C-alpha cells in the first residue's frame, strides 16, 4: 500500500494590479484595480475555483510620494475580506494587522467577527510594522525599536488568544421562557496585566466557528523566527534559494519543538513570483516586458527602503553594493540581510539588485512553463524547504488565472494538491485542530 503524497499548501497574495512594481504600467492592468470591489470579487472566485487554501491581503499604515502604486490607495483589509466572504464559501480569508499600532481588543474583535462572517475562514498575519514613518500617524515621533516591537507582539498575541476564549462554546442559552440569555459560568474575564498592556475582557463576540482564527507570522529575523516558532500556525517568508529555504525550514521546526509544539502543525510558505508561459522563451519575454517598465529612480528607492533608508546615490549603479550593517537598522532585518546575501552570492551590481528586488520585493522569481513550476514546487516541498507557497502574481488578473488554469491541474494530476475542498474552515484546510477553550471543563 503506497502512502499518500505530501499535499502542497497554496495561498494567493492579492495586490492591486500585481506584485511587480511596474505592473500598473502594463497595458493589460486595470487602472482602478486597488479600489475596485468587483475586480477583487473575481480574483477571489478564481482562487476558490482553483481550490486554493487562502487569500492573503497585506497592509501598511504609512505612505509617502515614493510608495508602491498598489499601496497609495487601497481598501482596508477587514472591510475588503468581509465583502469577499459573501462571494466565496471555502477559501481562507487572511490579512495583516500590526501589533505595534493596534490594541489587542480591537484585533481580537475584528478577526472574531470575520471568522463568524465567513463561517470559519479567518486568519491573522501578525506583523510589527517596519516603516519608520508609521509612528507619525499614531501620535508618535519615533518607531519602536526592533526587539521591543517583538516583545510587544508576543504579549499582544497571547492577549488576543485569551480574548478569543472569553466565551465557551455553549455560553449563549437565549432561553426566552426563563429570560436567561447566557450562562454566567461560561463567560470569562481575561484580567491581563503585563509589560505593555492591561486588558480585562471579556470580548463582546462569541466563540468563533474555528474556536480561534489561524495565526500567521511573516518575520524572518531572529526575533521574528522566535515569535513564529512560538505562536504561528502558518509562516510566510522570503526565500530565494533551495538551500537557504531548507535551513530556514529546519530552524523553525526545531525551535517550535523546543517550545513544546508539534512541528508538523506549522506550515511554512515562502512567497513565489511566477512568470508563466507555454515556453521558457515566452516566459522570459513576459518577464523582460515587466522589467523594462521599471523606472530606475523607483527601483533604486525600493532597494534603499529595504536597506533601512540608506542613500546609495553616491555609489555607481554598475558597481557592487557597499558593506552595510543590518543590525544597525530599525527596518526589516531579515529582508536587509536577504538583499545583502543575494548581492554577495550572485555578485550583483546595484542596478541588477534593484531591478531584481523592485520586481519581486526579494521573493523567489520563477520564469518558465507550468510543468517546470510544478516541478519546482514539488522539489521544494519534497526536500523540506517548505510546506507550500504563497503565490504572488506579478500581473493581475492574468497571473492568478494562468496559475489556476494551467499549474493547479498538473499538481492535482500528480496527487499533490486536492481536486476538491475536504473541509470548510481554514483550520481544516491546514489540518489544524480546533483549539480547546482554556476554561472548558
Swiss-Prot record:
- Part of which pathway? Amino-acid biosynthesis; L-cysteine biosynthesis
Q: Which residues form a coiled coil?
A: none
Q: Mutating residue 96 to V leads to what result?
A: Shows 0.9% of wild-type catalytic activity
Q: Please list every transmembrane segment annotated in the UniProt record, as residue ranges.
A: none
Which reaction(s) does its UniProt entry say it catalyses? N-acetyl-S-(2-succino)-L-cysteine + NADH + O2 + H(+) = N-acetyl-L-cysteine + oxaloacetate + NAD(+) + H2O
Q: Does the keyword Flavoprotein apply?
A: yes
Q: Which cysteines are joined by disulfide bonds?
A: none
Give the free-text miscellaneous remark of the entry. The substrate N-acetyl-S-(2-succino)-L-cysteine arises from the spontaneous Michael addition of cysteine to the citric acid cycle intermediate fumarate.
Q: Which family does it belong to?
A: Belongs to the NtaA/SnaA/DszA monooxygenase family.
Protein name per its UniProtKB record: N-acetyl-S-(2-succino)cysteine monooxygenase
Q: Source gene?
A: scmK
